[in-house]
Design a protein with these regions (language model features):
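Beta-rich carbohydrate-recognition modules and glycan-binding surfaces
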Residues: 1-196
Length: 196
């Protein structure tokens, strides 16, 4: 017996029942976070966390908190990206639970609702195949000062400092990153999921 979706919010894995994710009615979207928690907890039962270049001696300053933008709940990533000491990033990171990987077949990319300040940001994917902290698969997007839904196909992600092809079935972490140049980051993140 294989994986089956039993309706809204339930995934049947042989021997287990996981209330780990919500599916939209059309089942074309697997929701990782819908921002209904009011805190840093995601809909996929993992906490969002802030990662900055301080882990490598950088001095960028970042904040990550639940918030609201234009009447919608969001995760608010703010801060100053600075380049001193070989730094240059702040990141909202979400680890992907194994229960999501069990049902990932057939999904073709990441859907992201964002409201920004007109700056460019990156979406980074890390898999279990990457061991070095700077390795990832990356795609750049511009976040305009209005809510928009971005659909970023897995096929468009570029490997960064790795020769391995992206294996989505080994996805470990999703990172929404302000990176690479000195600027003020101000990004609201709404619903995050995978699309077919």
């Amino acid at each position: 017996m294989g994986l089956r979706f039993l309706g809204r919010g339930l995934l049947l894995v042989p021997g287990y029942l996981y209330p780990v994710m919500q599916l939209m009615a059309d089942q074309d979207m697997l929701i990782l976070d819908d921002r209904k928690s009011g805190d840093l907890q995601s809909a996929s039962d993992r906490q969002w966390h802030l990662v900055t270049d301080g882990v490598m001696g950088g001095v960028s300053d970042g904040r990550l908190a639940p918030g609201e933008m234009a009447g919608r709940p969001c995760l608010h990533l703010q801060g100053e990206v600075r380049l001193e000491n070989n730094g240059g990033f702040i990141q909202a990171a979400l680890d992907v639970p194994d229960t999501v990987l069990a049902g990932i077949t057939g999904y073709t990319g990441v859907s992201l609702e964002v409201y920004g300040n007109g700056e460019q940001y990156n979406l980074h994917l890390r898999t279990r195949d990457l061991w070095l902290p700077w390795q990832s698969y990356r795609m750049t997007f511009r976040a305009t000062p209005q809510w928009q839904t971005l659909r970023l196909p897995f096929a468009g992600f570029e490997p960064y400092r790795t020769g391995r092809a992206l294996d989505v079935g080994r996805l470990k972490r999703i990172g929404i990153v302000a990176i690479g140049r000195a600027f003020n980051a101000d990004l609201c993140i709404g619903k995050v999921g995978l699309f077919r």
